[in-house]
C-alpha cells in the first residue's frame, strides 16, 4: 500500500508550487517508508543470545557435553533469528539511536541525490520524513542557512514528528510546507521566476 495516494501526492506538489511563487527557495519533499531494513539486527541478537544463553545455563548446571552444547547454541541461534525477523520484533530490537542515525543519513543522501546542493544561490531546502522511524528533518543549503538559524526549524519538525506518529503524514506535509513558506517568503523572497527543481513529493518505497 502506498504511503500517500496519487491525489495526496498531488496536494503536496501543489503546496510546493504555492510556496515557490513567493520565494527563491527550491523546496523538495521526500517520504521514505523506512530508512533501513535492519536485516543485520536479527543476526546480531541471535548470535549474542545463541552464544550466551545455552553457555550460561550449561555453566551453572553442567548438563551438556561439548557436542550437545554446540547443538543447543546452533538451535537457539536459528530460533531467535527467525523470531527476530518478524518486522515488529525487529523494530523493537533496533536502538533508537541507530534508527535516528540511519534516517538522518538517508536524509543527507537525499539532499544530494535530489540536487538541492546545486541551486544557483544555494537556496535548496529538503523536508524529509522516514515513516517507520517516525523521523522528520529539515535540511537547508547555505543560501538559506545564512539567513535563518538552524533552530528556526525545530518547532516545525516537532509538530510534524507528532503528526507522523499519529498517522497524519499528509496533514504534516501540508502544514510544514505552509510554515516553511511563510518564513521563506520573508527571508528569501522571490526575485526571479525560474524553477530549478521539480515540485513534487519523492516517495521511497
Which sequence ranges carry the predicted segments?
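Short, charged cytosolic
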Residues: 3-27
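A membrane-cytosol interface segment of integral membrane proteins
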Residues: 4, 142-201
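Residue-level signature of catalytic and energy-coupling elements of molecular machines
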Residues: 24, 127, 176
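Select subsegments of transmembrane alpha-helices in polytopic membrane proteins
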Residues: 38-49
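Transmembrane alpha-helices and immediately adjacent membrane-cytoplasm interface residues
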Residues: 58-93
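Acidic/polar active-site rim loop that often engages polyanionic ligands
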Residues: 82-93, 136-140, 156-158, 162
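Membrane-cytosol interface motif
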Residues: 96-114
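Acidic, Ser/Thr-rich low-complexity segments on the non-lumenal side of membrane proteins
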Residues: 108-140
Amino acid at each position: 500500500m502506498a504511503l500517500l495516494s496519487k491525489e495526496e501526492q498531488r496536494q503536496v506538489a501543489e503546496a510546493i508550487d504555492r510556496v515557490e511563487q513567493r520565494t527563491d527557495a527550491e523546496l523538495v519533499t521526500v517520504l521514505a517508508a523506512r530508512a533501513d531494513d535492519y536485516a543485520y539486527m536479527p543476526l546480531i541478537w541471535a548470535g549474542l543470545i545463541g552464544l550466551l544463553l545455552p553457555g550460561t545455563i550449561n555453566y551453572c548446571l553442567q548438563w551438556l557435553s561439548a557436542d550437545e552444547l554446540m547443538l543447543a547454541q546452533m538451535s537457539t541461534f536459528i530460533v531467535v533469528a527467525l523470531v527476530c525477523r518478524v518486522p515488529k520484533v525487529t523494530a523493537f530490537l533496533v536502538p533508537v539511536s541507530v534508527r535516528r542515525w540511519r534516517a538522518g543519513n538517508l536524509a543527507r543522501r537525499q539532499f544530494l541525490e535530489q540536487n538541492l546542493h546545486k541551486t544557483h544561490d544555494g537556496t535548496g531546502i529538503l523536508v524529509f520524513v522516514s515513516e517507520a522511524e517516525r523521523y522528520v528533518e529539515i535540511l537547508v543549503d547555505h543560501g538559506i542557512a545564512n539567513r535563518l538559524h538552524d533552530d528556526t526549524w525545530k518547532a516545525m519538525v516537532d509538530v510534524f514528528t507528532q503528526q507522523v506518529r499519529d498517522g497524519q503524514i499528509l496533514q504534516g506535509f501540508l502544514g510544514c510546507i505552509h510554515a516553511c513558506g511563510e518564513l521563506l517568503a520573508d527571508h528569501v523572497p522571490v526575485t526571479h521566476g525560474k524553477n530549478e527543481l521539480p515540485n513534487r513529493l519523492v516517495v521511497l518505497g
